[in-house]
């Protein structure tokens, strides 16, 4: 697929930054490209610790929320948590439950069933809690859009607290965007208007932790015990794909470090079941190995199983549960592969191929993997993609977007066709009647205003850098940039006029490109590209330009530099 190459052009005195912080000028440029301008921001990025995290008291309603909770705890009232079935909801629920238990609360929790309940708090779950004698409901990773549901709970005389991080819902009134929030007793969400909290990109678990931190302060609990929540916040922050900037970066760095010494039996058992070494866990392992196992419970079974794993104190029980989670994830992978292929074929062989916004209906597909498949479709065609499946009542869909297309806003414009919707600029969830799927698809495509430039993937190059400049010392410095993820992507470099000396497709599945390239100054380097997927390979003797990331390769005791090809084109 053709892509646009763009070089960041942000200006700064890179030499001075390098001298002040003891880093290479290339590092200084990368950091500036991540939007950091002041010395304070750069220091937080490179050296931030838990002491640099923002005060939870800055969150609107956070103190009010804890005042309500402590009053309920002292009065012996029942508190009920309603979470979510994804990794963020799982970790958020675990944090709230452990924290409230530590404060002496009579607390229980429920996670909505993805198939039966759908996303978030609903009347069925409210009735269930009410009939069990619940006085107070507290949500996590959901609730900000549950206006009617929370009104229903209030009419039953219940106290309701919302902790959430999702975008604030809105209506268009006379062309103006009007935000609306539920009439809860307290709402803790950094995205709220008039919330003075300086960072609005926390995940749900991050918001839940802020509440528990204040609760520990107010109840006089041992603050060192808060450390046991570190890895849960890190897992949720990585798994929910929020920006790894500001304090999210601290959360992940500290959480990964603490993971090596975690006392959480369930996490240890899951790491063991995934055949990983606990002292070598990176953000990659969380995002692509451990996280999917936790998520698989909410997709194919009940997310309660994952929470019970994270709460157990029995190692034998933990190992049993961890193996069950891994087995579920294998099943989830098989389903995903099958229906992703069907979705791609449907786009390629029908009128959908001409749409700018892809809406694919897979009636027989398990609704829990719709989001993953939407991501695959987006990756294949570079179009905003929504995969819709048949549900218990009508249809449900999950969408994944591209930069330049705010999926939540665009879906909101079609709100009259939907029964329920919510999400972010880059992802959304919907429910609608099956009969309205085609009308919804047409409305999205009629409303869209994406240019060809938006519909062409862009590769952003941090620094045009000759391969001759790269050495192991520089690559070692790049470790200071970790953890990588959304908002802090792995740095990308580019070089030109590289002569292809060798070029071959290797690997068991013949999907890896291995090249030997010669620079203009005669330096020979090894370059490799994974997941070829039928792409063209460069011809020997021709000159290419290459977008790359340099890595250290260790094999049979030999340490060498290997260039990972992100993209290439003939000169």
What do these predicted ranges mean?
Residues 12-14, 116, 193-196, 468-470, ...:
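A short acidic, often aromatic-flanked loop/helix-cap motif at beta-alpha or helix-coil junctions
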């Amino acid at each position: 697929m053709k892509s646009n190459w763009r070089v960041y052009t942000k200006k700064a005195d890179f030499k001075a930054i390098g001298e002040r912080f003891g880093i290479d000028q290339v590092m200084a440029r990368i950091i500036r490209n991540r939007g950091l301008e002041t010395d304070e921001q750069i220091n937080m990025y490179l050296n931030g610790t838990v002491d640099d995290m923002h005060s939870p008291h800055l969150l609107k309603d956070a103190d009010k929320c804890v005042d309500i909770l402590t009053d309920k705890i002292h009065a012996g009232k029942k508190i009920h948590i309603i979470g979510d079935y994804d990794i963020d909801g799982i970790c958020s629920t675990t944090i709230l439950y452990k924290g409230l238990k530590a404060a002496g609360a009579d607390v229980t929790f429920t996670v909505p069933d993805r198939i039966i309940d759908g996303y978030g708090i609903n009347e069925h779950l409210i009735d269930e809690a009410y009939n069990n004698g619940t006085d107070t409901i507290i949500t996590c990773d959901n609730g900000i859009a549950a206006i009617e549901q929370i009104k229903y709970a209030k009419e039953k005389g219940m106290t309701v607290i919302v902790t959430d991080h999702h975008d604030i819902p809105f209506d268009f009134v006379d062309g103006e965007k009007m935000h609306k929030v539920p009439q809860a007793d307290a709402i803790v969400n950094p995205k709220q208007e008039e919330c003075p909290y300086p960072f609005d990109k926390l995940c749900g678990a991050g918001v839940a932790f802020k509440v528990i931190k204040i609760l520990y302060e107010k109840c006089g609990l041992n603050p060192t015990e808060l450390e046991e929540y570190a890895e849960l916040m890190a897992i949720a922050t990585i798994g929910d794909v929020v920006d790894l900037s500001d304090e999210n970066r601290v959360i992940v760095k500290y959480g990964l470090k603490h993971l090596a010494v975690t006392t959480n039996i369930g996490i240890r058992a899951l790491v063991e079941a995934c055949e990983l070494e606990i002292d070598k866990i990176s953000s990659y392992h969380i995002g692509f190995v451990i996280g999917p196992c936790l998520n698989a419970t909410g997709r194919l079974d009940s997310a309660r199983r994952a929470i019970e794993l994270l709460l157990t104190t029995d190692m034998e029980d933990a190992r049993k549960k961890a193996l069950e989670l891994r087995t579920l994830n294998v099943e989830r992978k098989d389903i995903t592969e099958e229906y992703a292929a069907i979705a791609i074929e449907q786009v390629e062989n029908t009128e959908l191929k001409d749409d700018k916004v892809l809406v694919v209906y897979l009636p027989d597909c398990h609704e829990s993997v719709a989001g993953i498949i939407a991501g695959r479709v987006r990756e294949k065609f570079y179009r905003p993609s929504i995969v819709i499946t048949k549900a218990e009542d009508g249809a449900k869909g999950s969408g994944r977007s591209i930069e330049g297309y705010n999926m939540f806003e665009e879906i909101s414009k079609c709100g009259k066709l939907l029964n329920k919707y919510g999400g972010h600029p880059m992802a959304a969830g919907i429910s609608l009647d099956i009969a309205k799927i085609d009308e919804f698809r047409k409305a999205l495509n009629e409303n869209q205003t994406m240019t060809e430039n938006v519909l062409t993937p862009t590769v952003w190059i941090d620094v045009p850098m000759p391969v001759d400049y790269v050495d192991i010392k520089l690559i070692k410095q790049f470790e200071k940039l970790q953890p990588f993820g959304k908002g802090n992507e792995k740095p990308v470099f580019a070089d030109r006029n590289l002569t292809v000396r060798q070029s071959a497709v290797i690997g068991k599945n013949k999907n890896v490109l291995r090249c030997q390239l010669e620079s203009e100054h005669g330096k020979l380097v090894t370059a490799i590209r994974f997941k070829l997927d039928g792409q063209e390979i460069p011809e020997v003797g021709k000159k290419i330009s290459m977008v790359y990331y340099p890595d250290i390769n260790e094999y049979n005791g030999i340490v060498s530099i290997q260039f990972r090809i992100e993209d290439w084109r003939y000169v």
